[in-house]
């Protein structure tokens, strides 16, 4: 059975190397072991990308050894998506363009199994639109990474972004909403070796960002907007009733839970019960297989998904059919 991992991360080494040459923040530095540590501001480490993030050939080799056939991937930026929206406009533009070119190069090199997604510098709306148009139109990337925060103004529901969402809807490409390690990295989750942040902070961040898309009316004004909220939709499906109970001030024409159910999600729980609830809440047609690799190991994701009580036809949708439809995948990739 064909498998497409819709939540996969590959970090091009040349991108991190370029960021390590910055003298101002945000920047990164090599860890001496093939990875990089990223810093948003002085003394605050926001993410550590180990060597496992940087070697695409070895990532494919690992998946090929799972004895599940060839596993294809859709590569997204993960927490790194925020960086190009925190740089000065011109530098953010050039950085995003460089990222997108590297993704397109990987699509050409691994045309039978790799699709890339676009970086956009949201600190400037028109620049973001121009970069996105180039990434989707010229380079053939299949999705757009939407960071949960944007530079000095960390709200993705800002009215100035309305033309951006207009264009995303026109292009009919999915937004991948992923936590950025920027909102809850300090007082909220300090201590315990980063456990509070990794287990709760990221989930809260992606949930708050998705909620803003609902309460601001972005989802209402853009009925054809497709948003993949990673990590089984954060807390949204579990708290849908509270959204409906408390959502009156937003004055939406529908209950907030209706907009939540419009989202797509993946199966990065990681637990069998979490997967089961995501499937029941969002419905089979809005769930894609994903692992968050290398943050989570695909063999564990596969074992948990094997426990799900779904039909063969639905299993095929989740493993590949839904991703092919959502991202409008073609194979081999033609760039």
What residue ranges belong to the model's regions?
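Catalytic metal-binding/acid-base residues of hydrolase active sites
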Residues: 9, 180-181, 214, 233, ...
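Alpha-helical structural signal in soluble globular domains
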Residues: 102-109, 134, 138, 163, ...
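Active-site gating/metal-coordination segments in enzymes
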Residues: 70, 75-209
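Aromatic-lined glycan-binding groove of carbohydrate-active enzymes
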Residues: 214-260
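Hydrophobic faces of well-ordered beta-strands that scaffold small-molecule active sites
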Residues: 4-6, 72-75, 115-118, 144-146, ...
